[in-house]
Amino acid sequence: MDKYELVKDIGAGNFGVARLMRVKNSKELVAMKYIERGPKIDENVAREIINHRSLRHPNIIRFKEVVLTPTHIAIAMEYAAGGELFERICSAGRFSEDEARYFFQQLISGVSYCHAMQICHRDLKLENTLLDGSPAPRLKICDFGYSKSSLLHSMPKSTVGTPAYIAPEVLSRGEYDGKMADVWSCGVTLYVMLVGAYPFEDQEDPKNFKKTIQRIMAVKYKIPDYVHISQDCKHLLSRIFVTNSNKRITIGDIKKHPWFLKNLPRELTEIAQAAYFRKENPTFSLQSVEEIMKIVEEAKTPARVSRSIGAFGWGGGEDAEGKEEDAEEEVEEVEEEEDEEDEYDKTVKQVHASMGEVRVS
């Protein structure tokens, strides 16, 4: 960790804390995601790191390295200065059709690459799509904590993901094609960009999970009258929001759809993208899989001394104590978020119990 210096805290989530760090020698900024050593270091963490390491594409956040500290495992990755796509939509309310298409084209490009690498994301959402700091922002997919690789694992069975983005077959709790579930989530992302609301939530009762799930299973959505979009766009959404995943449009066919192809940037064309699909392409990370797995195994051993994330000793100085207090507050917030998520999981189970076994026709 000596090669990095702390710049600022940039967020907290169920995983732990994220910080903006600077490489001392090169002055390069990186995002560092910290996960506490011990029981939190499970197969999901290992899978996220190994899957992320294998990906090399301009629409995917670059993995750099994993580092072990006395208290945490730290995952260093590319820093996206433009923040979340979610924040951009919150500021704008909703996007024009052209702007939504611009970001959707990049999203599909990144997801298509993941699928070609036999990795399905399983938690695609606006909060997991970041933007770089350029004037015409480049979209970057991040957070591979739930992703599954068909090269390493069996078919996904667990119900993961954010409620509003979950495909019907995932709610059915049987085996499902993770790639087709990703297509559904991409459709939800497109809808939110166009409308500024989630397609299957009751706007007057958004926290009613039972109603949301019923609407997802019935594919009950509509484009509000105040949103004016082309017939091609409506057609694409209707091909994505299909209950039976076998009849849903594939990523390959989305890339051939007239709406997708309109104003497609040259770097996203099939010819330009071919360069990223070469098997001999090196990864961004110099760490081998063996080195990474060794660090992950070590991280399963809890820290001997309980120490806040602010006590890592970067930057020191007069404000170190204040930073430690801030970090402790962040950890408390994370714990609260985890409690909320646990509550949601309970609610989903209750919904399933009240609805009986949900089936996809």
From Swiss-Prot:
Leader sequence residues: none
Keywords: ATP-binding, Kinase, Nucleotide-binding, Phosphoprotein, Serine/threonine-protein kinase, Transferase
Active site residues per record: 123
Tissue: Expressed in seedlings.
Gene Ontology molecular function: ATP binding; kinase activity; phosphatidic acid binding; protein kinase activity; protein serine kinase activity; protein serine/threonine kinase activity
Residue positions, PTM Phosphoserine: 154
UniProt domain Protein kinase: residue ranges: 4-260
GO cellular component: cytosol; nucleus
Record's compositionally biased regions (Acidic residues): 318-344
Residues where ATP binds: 10-18, 33
Induction, as annotated: By salt and osmotic stress (at protein level).
Entry EC no(s): 2.7.11.1
Region listing for Disordered, in residue ranges: 311-361
InterPro entries: Kinase-like_dom_sf (IPR011009), Prot_kinase_dom (IPR000719), Protein_kinase_ATP_BS (IPR017441), Ser/Thr_kinase_AS (IPR008271)
Domain of life (superkingdom): Eukaryota
Catalyzed reactions per annotation: L-seryl-[protein] + ATP = O-phospho-L-seryl-[protein] + ADP + H(+); L-threonyl-[protein] + ATP = O-phospho-L-threonyl-[protein] + ADP + H(+)
Protein's GO biological process: lateral root development; response to osmotic stress; response to salt stress
PANTHER family: SERINE/THREONINE KINASE, SERINE_THREONINE-PROTEIN KINASE SRK2A-RELATED
Membership in a protein family: Belongs to the protein kinase superfamily. Ser/Thr protein kinase family.
Protein name: Serine/threonine-protein kinase SRK2B
Organism, scientific name: Arabidopsis thaliana (Mouse-ear cress)
Taxonomic classification: Eukaryota, Viridiplantae, Streptophyta, Embryophyta, Tracheophyta
Name of the gene this protein is made from: SRK2B
